[in-house]
Amino acid sequence: MATTIHSSSLDFTAIKNNLKTYLQQQSEFKDYDFEAAGLSNILDVLAYNTHMNGLTANFALNESFLNTAQLRSSVVSHAETLGYVPASKSAAQATVNLSFNIGIDQEDVPEKLQVSSGYKFTSSVNDASYTFQTQELIEATNDGNNFFQFQTLDGSTEIPVFEGIAKTKTFFAGEDTEGTLYIIPDVNMDRSTAVVKVYESATSGDFTSYINLEVATNIDVTTPAYILKEAPNGYYELSFGNGSTLGAVPTAGSKVTIEYLSVDGSNANGARLFEPVNTIEVTEPTSGIGLERLPVVSTTNRSVGGSAKESLASIRKNSPYRYATQNRMVTHADYASLVLRTYGALIDD
């Protein structure tokens, strides 16, 4: 009776020996020399094919489960089935005081100054240069002596600046807007800085600001919500609702823009000195003459919070807990999951 081939081992030599033992016990091959070049080569091919098939089956099965998957694309995909979107890279953030003194002798000075979002600074960490910028409008009021202290819109003199290069990607919606995926080819995107706008047409100046579906509290057919998640190749894909239960969907021919920061993550942590890149123009109200001044910058908090993409170990740990919380904050585990999601760049799991 023929000996059964043992198929539990993936070792190439063991597979070849098992094949040889099996064939030697077949009457058709009783007097064959299996060490001869011809038969040995045939056994090598059979063993190699069996070895590769076994490895492929083993790898494929491992990639089918969250706990055993090794490829990032597989882990991210499994997390997605639990409603979990792994964290992207995050920008390092610092706070600065920003001011300048035009001089008490200067006449015809405006009462208020405003600087739009995107005012840039440079800094360095370990001899590498990084760009930081504001993410909101800041303004300053003349104190009566031509001194201007800039503040955020909520009145704070500590102005947050974020590391990264501002980028904008533009798309045009086609006919099948519900199933369209818009790919942003940037592995360094900070998802939290994304701003999505949908214009009525390519030439229209009117737009609707869309919100991230993750933070939407009430979703219906008119809710302007977007979905932004990591694609299998490490880029990011933008999509919209279905026009009913998941919110509004852009109409065909509309223009879609996404603005975001492309960041260096943890490399930019620890920046202390910030140099303004551009002057701030002060226009005299009466004459219309523009004066340009470099503001004085003082650091109140060095840059922190920059991080790499969420690790595979962190995704495996956090995604089941996130699924269990369902965005609630009731049990201690709910709080732990949501705190890790919000402040994961600042604390350890």
Give names to the regions the model predicted.
Residues M1-D349:
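Signature of Asx- and small-polar-rich beta-strand/turn repeats characteristic
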